[in-house]
Amino acid sequence: MVSATTQLKLRAADGKKYNTDVLDAKGIVLLAKSVSNQRAMAFLDWLTYSDSTLDGQSRKKAYALFESKLIDSIPVGTVKGLQQIHSLLFGGLYDFAGKIRTKTISKGGFTFCLHEYLPKQLEIVERMPETTFDEIADKYVEMNVCHPFMEGNGRATRIWLDLMLKARLQRCVDWSKINKNDYLQAMTLSVADATRIKTLLQGALTDRINDREMFMKGIDYSYYYEQQE
């Protein structure tokens, strides 16, 4: 908005409208740089797409995934499709991008599918039906339990979920409607009971499946979910 705005009129207490001072894009950048704060710098990186961290570079790749239309060629609901998403997000950043892990990993005291059983379990998940919302959500939850990659599972799998919803139900998730902590807690609980994550996802469904803004916003929130507070 600030990039396209040169002047703005607001109504004052006397009932008259006056021109206000506004900042153009360059001014916003200078303002953010003047604030000695980690969050301000993170905002600046987001605004200018200049984040040189691994996550920042991967996020740019995610944007390009939509802009290039590569996303339309990914096989939906398959392990191969998920590997392609992961490779496109993390290629050149991780040497294991798109590769199924060969080690067992854990997080927060929970051990994901043991690596020796992972190939077979992935075959089982791939064969799960995906014709209804409940089936798609169950498939997403089971793929999360598999956690097929060493890193980057959540970011890749959320796109994988949206592609299934788009192809089968003509819907996708408006991730901006799902609170980060609520989502993380629901995913933790989903190992035993998927009710909570299904409620969150269903409440955030939208038919804006071809909306560029919706996809880009979803990417921003997806990467935000992974940030350490």
Can you name each region flagged by the protein language model?
Residues 44-46, 96-105, 153, 198-202, ...:
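Short coil/turn segments at secondary-structure boundaries
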Residues 109-147:
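Helix-hairpin-helix/helix-loop-helix acidic hairpins
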Residues 93, 182, 187-229:
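Acidic, carboxylate-rich catalytic segments that either coordinate divalent cations
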Residues 3-7, 174-182:
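Substrate-binding beta-hairpin/strand module that engages nucleic acids
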Residues 1-51:
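An anion-engaging/catalytic patch
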Residues 135-169:
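Catalytic DNA-binding helix-loop module of base-excision-repair DNA glycosylases/AP lyases
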Residues 36-91, 95, 164-175, 227:
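N-terminal structured helix/loop subdomain that forms the ligand-binding/catalytic interface
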Residues 88-94, 99-112:
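Active-site substrate-recognition loop segments, prototypically the cytochrome P450 B′-helix/B-C loop
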